[in-house]
Structures are given as structure tokens and as C-alpha cells.
From Swiss-Prot:
This is Proline--tRNA ligase. It is an enzyme of class 6 (ligase). Catalyzes the attachment of proline to tRNA(Pro) in a two-step reaction: proline is first activated by ATP to form Pro-AMP and then transferred to the acceptor end of tRNA(Pro). As ProRS can inadvertently accommodate and process non-cognate amino acids such as alanine and cysteine, to avoid such errors it has two additional distinct editing activities against alanine. One activity is designated as 'pretransfer' editing and involves the tRNA(Pro)-independent hydrolysis of activated Ala-AMP. Pfam families: HGTP_anticodon, tRNA-synt_2b, tRNA_edit. It is found in: Cytoplasm. It comes from Nitratiruptor sp. (strain SB155-2). GO terms for cellular component: cytosol. Its EC number is 6.1.1.15. It comes from the Bacteria. Belongs to the class-II aminoacyl-tRNA synthetase family. ProS type 1 subfamily.
Length: 569
């Protein structure tokens, strides 16, 4: 490919409202252009990167025995009603009606469509297992699209669905998909971790996310410093917290006057007691299909509430903040809430089970209770609702955990029979009995991977593409196209590399050398070959984009040298 004939509209200025490197460089480098909020067009080199990622994903999935299909982008609402998700998914699900008033949705995921495809077509255990996937565009009407391709409304996704006769076989496929995903992300040249995760709106029994490690990631991950344990903080566990200080001694359980003191830090200073020995109360309004209620969550003063864990503990669709006025109407005193004598639902963190000698709210303004004993709460709901923090201990090996940021690029789920049972999708087992399919589902954000790769691989000059997915592997930069010797050598080398199977572009534009090298750095081709003034002395330069190191070599060695570098990567 010749640069002079390729549509690569690079820009000098950063796009408006872009804050992340991937958003800035993908727009400036001529990879994508915005059409509307959260919707982007892929230009030639952006489409090329996308296709390379897609090819690696497809190759590994096909190798694992998966079969590719292509499902409709538009899904009838009836299928979502069958699964029970139509009313639960929220405004992110874009609904519309056709001219005949039939209701449809633009599918953000395709569980319903895939179940509908398989039911009545796969009727016997002899036809199982089956793993079908597609790589198609999806739409999710995000409330706040941002960060370019990382949180758009339209996105290219690989979604796969497996069907099994029993749980054991589903878990076998789940493990195979984890291995396959590791192969995919490894081949893409990414630093990533597979982490335990919450099942979220998809549902199921267990799930893992694949996180590209990057400081710009929206997700926080807890990672053990010694073993392989890693989890999204929404699902992360920890070993029981060790007491950080000596427990206070209280002779009685009684109220104590604490005027204008309600925060844990203020109370800790006042009582000279570590926050660990306080009971923190967090009030939330839980929303369900059938209504709403106020729920009080209690945990140690040194911990923070993990809202996803808390919501899962009570089976809520969503949790929102509750106003002081609403609390007061329910007989609850804001800032001084105790787990005692409450009429509404209470949930206590498992670390408080059996705890004694604590300080908690007094259910009365400006009062706290000292000497609280939670060992009396035998029938209360104790469950893990605390957010894992830096320095907590690994639940598997007991080593210290650290927190880091990640970008979710893949997610696998053990779905079980949630969708098949709801949609009456059954097969006949060995005994001739009808049973719902046991399912797994497996997703990869293909277009998100374009951005995630740059979040992990960039510098202040632009993109640094891994060679496997770079728009071109080698950029031949002819410094002065008016120099016949330079252009002739560049043309000859271009043909040699192209014939050898190297993905190469020849920068033959009638531009000065400065803009050409800046575009090389901005776009991020892994290798550049500078054909310049040194050619008269028989040398050219090879520059590696990652390090920007330049090596001058004899012109007769350049073909062999660059070929070895590309083939070794």
C-alpha cells in the first residue's frame, strides 16, 4: 500500500472532549471518526486493525470447535418477554416499533435469539454439546457515552453460546473457553488478567472477566501478590480481617452523648478507638419488580460498602440513595443508626458476625451506643458486603492483595438453565426425558480491544501497536521523493517486502521528512525504514516505534534485517 493513495486523515490537534490516549490517538491518527455520541466510523487503517483482531478471535474459536453464525441485529420483543429481561434491562435497551406496530429491540446481547435458534432444532442429547458464536455489531443506549471506543453505544462484539446436557459438560466448555480467551489475548500482545466477577444482568452461576491492565480502566481489580487469585472488586473476597489494634473495653452497654459527631473519623478521634471497632450504617433504597424498600447495611467502620455485593445480597434490581427526609419518615435517625430495634430490613457484613465491644449509632440524635454486642444477632443476615481494599489478605493463600485498574475486554459465564428454562428450550436426555439445555455464554469486545490496546501501548507521541494487529508492520519513509535514488530504493524494497508477505506501506507523499516521521510516530507502525541522505553512503536507518531507537545499517542488509525482526515478533 502507498501512503499517497491511502485515506489516512491525520490531525495535529486533539479532538474536543477526548481525555483518554486511545480516544485522542485513534481520532488524530485517522483510525476512526465520530458520527454521533458514542457512534464511530472506522476509516481504512482502523478497519484494518479491527479485521486483524477479528481474524485472531475467529481463528482461536474455530480451533476450539466453535461454529460461527450471524444473527439478526434486530430482535423481536417477544423473545425478551419470554426470558423475562424486557422489563428489567432498563433504558440501555433500545426499543422501537415497525409500521405494523410490532415491537423490536436492538440487541445488546443475543441470548434470546440464540436459544430461539437452537430450540426445536436440537432435540436430543446426541446433538450436544454445541457452541455457536457470532462477531456482529451491537447497540446499547448508554446514558453517558464517553472515552471513544471504550464506552460507545454501537460496538463490535463476539458473543458465543454453548448448549450442554449437564452442568459437568458446561463447566468443561467454560474451562476450554477460558483457555481459548487466554490464547486470544496473548496473541494480541496484551498484558491481562482473568478475574472472578459478578454475573450482573446476564445472570448465571459463575463468571470471569478478562481485564487489560491499564491505569485508565474503569474497573478496579484486587490481585494477590503471591498466587493467581484476582477478582473485580464487585466480587472480590478476602480472608477475615485481622484486628488492627487492641479492642476497647466497655463495662456496660449504654448510650453515650456525642454532640455533632456522626462521621467515623470524628468518632474515632473522640473515643480514641480505631475505626475497626465502630459499626458503620449505610442506608439505601432497594428497587424490585414488585416495589421498593429501605434497607440498612452495617459493616465495620474501617470498611466501605460494596454496592454490587449489597444489591445481590437482597436480590434487588437496583439500589439508589435514600434522602434524610425519607429516613426520618421511617423512624430512622440519619447519622446515628443502630442495628437494634429497626423495622426495616437490615443486612450485616460477615466480618461483624459474633463481634463484641463495638460502638454504633444510638437511634437518637447526638447519641451512640458503646459496648454493642452483635453475637446476639443469630437470625440476622450476615453476608459479604464490604469492598476489598489495598492490603487485605487473599482468600486463597493469605498473602497481601493490591488494587489495580483494568479494562474489561472479555467475559465468560456459566449460565445454567436460566434462559433455556424460561424459554422452554429442551432436549431429550438418555432416558427420553425432556430437560432444559445447560448453557454457557462467552463475550469479547472486539472494537473495545482496539482502544484497550492503545491504552496499554502508547507514549506522548502516539500509538505503539503490537505487531500482530498493527495497521501495517513496516513503514518505508522516503525522505525526499525528488531524489531519484531514494525513491528507486524505496520502491524496490517495498516490492521485496510485499512479496515476502510483510504488511508494508510506502510513504511516497510529496511531504517534508518532518510530517512523515510525525505520522509514523502518531499512527504507531512497529517498524520504520528511513531512506534518506545516508543512502549516498550506502546506509539506511531502521527505527523501532516502541523505543524510537534508530540503527544505521548497510542498504543491502535492510531487507534481511527487517524480515527477521517481523518474523521474530
Amino acid at each position: 500500500m502507498r501512503f499517497s493513495k491511502t485515506f489516512i486523515p491525520t490531525m495535529k490537534e486533539n479532538p474536543k472532549d477526548a481525555v483518554l490516549p486511545s480516544h485522542i490517538y485513534l481520532v488524530r491518527g485517522g483510525f476512526i471518526t465520530q458520527v454521533a455520541s458514542g457512534i464511530y466510523n472506522f476509516l481504512p487503517i482502523g478497519k484494518k486493525v479491527l479485521d486483524k483482531i477479528r481474524a485472531i478471535v475467529k481463528e482461536e474459536l474455530d480451533k476450539a470447535g466453535c461454529q460461527e453464525v450471524s444473527l439478526g441485529f434486530v430482535t423481536p420483543c417477544e423473545l425478551w418477554e419470554e426470558s423475562g429481561r424486557l422489563g428489567k434491562y432498563g433504558k440501555e435497551l433500545l426499543r422501537f416499533k415497525d409500521r405494523k406496530e410490532n415491537c423490536f429491540v436492538l440487541g445488546p446481547t443475543h441470548e434470546e435469539m440464540m436459544v430461539d435458534l437452537v430450540r426445536n432444532r436440537v432435540t436430543s442429547y446426541k446433538q450436544l454439546p454445541l457452541n455457536l458464536y457470532q462477531i456482529n455489531w451491537k447497540f446499547r443506549d448508554e446514558a453517558r457515552p464517553r472515552f471513544g471506543l471504550l464506552r460507545g453505544r454501537e460496538f463490535l462484539m463476539k458473543d458465543g453460546y454453548s448448549f450442554h446436557a449437564d452442568e459437568e459438560d458446561m463447566r468443561r466448555e467454560y474451562d476450554l473457553m477460558e483457555k481459548t480467551y487466554r490464547n486470544i489475548f496473548g496473541r494480541l500482545g496484551l498484558r491481562f488478567r482473568a478475574v472472578e466477577a459478578d454475573v450482573g444482568a446476564i445472570g448465571g452461576n459463575a463468571s470471569k472477566e478478562f481485564m487489560v491492565l491499564a491505569e485508565s480502566g474503569e474497573d478496579t481489580i484486587a490481585i494477590c501478590t503471591e498466587c493467581e487469585y484476582a477478582a473485580n472488586v464487585e466480587a472480590a473476597k478476602r480472608k477475615k480481617t485481622k484486628a488492627p489494634a487492641e479492642a476497647p473495653e466497655f463495662s456496660n452497654f449504654e448510650p453515650f452523648y456525642t454532640p455533632n459527631l456522626s462521621s467515623i473519623d470524628e468518632l474515632s478521634d473522640f473515643f480514641k478507638v480505631h475505626p475497626y471497632y465502630f459499626v458503620k450504617a449505610v442506608a439505601k433504597k432497594a428497587l424490585y419488580d414488585e416495589g421498593e424498600e429501605i434497607v440498612l447495611f452495617f459493616l465495620r467502620g474501617s470498611d466501605e460498602l460494596q454496592e454490587v455485593k449489597a444489591s445481590n445480597a437482597i436480590g434487588a434490581n437496583e439500589m439508589v440513595d435514600v434522602s434524610e427526609e425519607e429516613l426520618e419518615k421511617s423512624g430512622i435517625v440519619p447519622g446515628f443508626i443502630a442495628p437494634y430495634e429497626q423495622k426495616c430490613k437490615i443486612v450485616l457484613d460477615e466480618d461483624l458476625k459474633g463481634a463484641k465491644g463495638l460502638i454504633c449509632g444510638g437511634n437518637k440524635k447526638d447519641y451512640h451506643l458503646i459496648g454493642a454486642d452483635l453475637s446476639q444477632f443469630d437470625d440476622a443476615l450476615f453476608v459479604d458486603i464490604a469492598q476489598v481494599k489495598e492490603g487485605d489478605l487473599c482468600p486463597k493463600c493469605g498473602a497481601v492483595m493490591k488494587l489495580t485498574k483494568g479494562i474489561e475486554v472479555g467475559h465468560i459465564f456459566q449460565l445454567g438453565t436460566r434462559y433455556s428454562a424460561a424459554m422452554n428450550a429442551t432436549f431429550l436426555d438418555k432416558d427420553g426425558k425432556a430437560k432444559p439445555f445447560v448453557m454457557g455464554t462467552y463475550g469479547i469486545g472486539v472494537s473495545r480491544l482496539v482502544a484497550a490496546s492503545i491504552e496499554q501501548n502508547h507514549d506522548e507521541r502516539g500509538c505503539i501497536w503490537p505487531l500482530q494487529i498493527a495497521p501495517f508492520e513496516v513503514d518505508i519513509i522516503v525522505s525526499n521523493i525528488k531524489d531519484e535514488e531514494q525513491i528507486a530504493f524505496g520502491e524496490e524494497l517495498y516490492e521485496q517486502l510485499k512479496n515476502a508477505g510483510v504488511d508494508v506501506i510506502l510513504d511516497d507523499r510529496p511531504e517534508r521528512f518532518g510530517p512523515k516521521i510525525k505520522d509514523f510516530e502518531l499512527i504507531g507502525f512497529p517498524y520504520g525504514i528511513i531512506v534518506g541522505k545516508g543512502l549516498k553512503e550506502g546506509t539506511v536507518q531502521i527505527v523501532q516505534r516502541e523505543t524510537l531507537d534508530k540503527v544505521e545499517i548497510p542498504k543491502e542488509d535492510v531487507f534481511k534485517t527487517i524480515l527477521e525482526k517481523v518474523q521474530a515478533s
